Amino acid sequence: MLYPEYPEYDNFNESGALIKVVGVGGGGGNAVNHMVMNMVKQEMGGTFVGESSLTSEEHGRIVFYAVNTDAQALRKSQVQQTVQIGGETTKGLGAGANPNIGRKAAEDDQDEIRKMLEGADMVFIAAGMGGGTGTGAAPVVAKIAKELGILTVAVVTKPFTFEGKKRMQFAELGIKDLSQYVDSMIIIPNQQIQKVLPKNAKLIDAFAAANDVLRNSVMGISDMITSPGLINVDFADVRTVMSVQGQAMIGFGSAVGEPGAGRAEEAARLAVRNDLLEKIDLSNAQGILVNITAGMDLVFEEFNIIGETIGSFASEEATVVVGTSLVPEMSDEIRVTIVATGLGEIAGNEPIQVVRQGLSTQNIEGEGRVNIVPELHRRESVEVSRTASEEYQRPLDKPITDRLEAFKKNNFFNPAQREEN
């Protein structure tokens, strides 16, 4: 029997795969800042390259970067490694909600971006879509990562509906542009935040919860490939699954209770199911990565139930990888992390998948709850007039309809034509 051929991967050094997390623009930068601060406070994750004492050799390496046209935002960033782009075009004042300027800024500093990405085995690109730098520059960063052969996952947001149709249109076009270069993309609509959090939730808490999605996504995959387990998941497994292009989903479920079918079913249900995701078809997932983390009391029945639950929505040709980590300190708890990829082509008018996380501390007989939060809020740059060139000049009072025409003129909507010009 001949088995299908898979690409060969180099052996990784003992310190583990190098993961780089790049926040592009205001929203992406905020998400990465949030992750850095939480890692410092909780001392979780791998070898944190930055101003921290996180040096656990049991985890892989994670390096953080902030990329922005806004010099002030970079100065305030908690991320030690920053890359300012488009200094000549923007004078350090931001892209003014103009993706064309964000794109040109990144293209002007491609060499710096390339240096930033070199050496990485996997890159997460975080960005808010619909504004200037995130929408315009993130595809350029992803394209360079692709040229370097780096496994690349984008975690992006779409605007609130009250921000207008034009901003949403820019976001959808930016997502379409970005999708050409990433291996997988996780898209979260900011509008979901009002459906998840209580009405009296504080704004700062809402955005903090939203930014946890990037942190959980990065740490979930990092823990999969770096934590020793009874059944290990290595980076080659992650690459095989995440390389299935299209929409992706990362889910987290946790349940507490006596070992047995009850808590396993609960954790798996929380990881794969939520009413807010009913428009998303998981039945055709082409790649599935599962990691089960539990104490020494994990029983075979639980392992089998979780596997069957996950397998129920996989396509017949799907690549399914299941890993298991036993943590002696965990008592009565089981956690399930799921990565599903190849869920369909990414298009602006397609239903959007949501990254979700679940936690159940109820007795198994009771109903658990699913906690789903949208990810990344954006930090608006101050709108300013551009004087670097007539092509990218945008006065403060220029109507958005005129800006849309300018986008079309400069082939923002057609990446292929942009490359030919």
Swiss-Prot record:
It is found in: Cytoplasm. GTP binds at residues 26-30, 132-134, 163, 167, 211. This is Cell division protein FtsZ. It comes from Haemophilus influenzae (strain ATCC 51907 / DSM 11121 / KW20 / Rd). NCBIfam families: ftsZ (TIGR00065). Essential cell division protein that forms a contractile ring structure (Z ring) at the future cell division site. The regulation of the ring assembly controls the timing and the location of cell division. One of the functions of the FtsZ ring is to recruit other cell division proteins to the septum to produce a new cell wall between the dividing cells. Binds GTP and shows GTPase activity. It comes from the Bacteria. Pfam families: FtsZ_C, Tubulin. Homodimer. Polymerizes to form a dynamic ring structure in a strictly GTP-dependent manner. Interacts directly with several other division proteins.
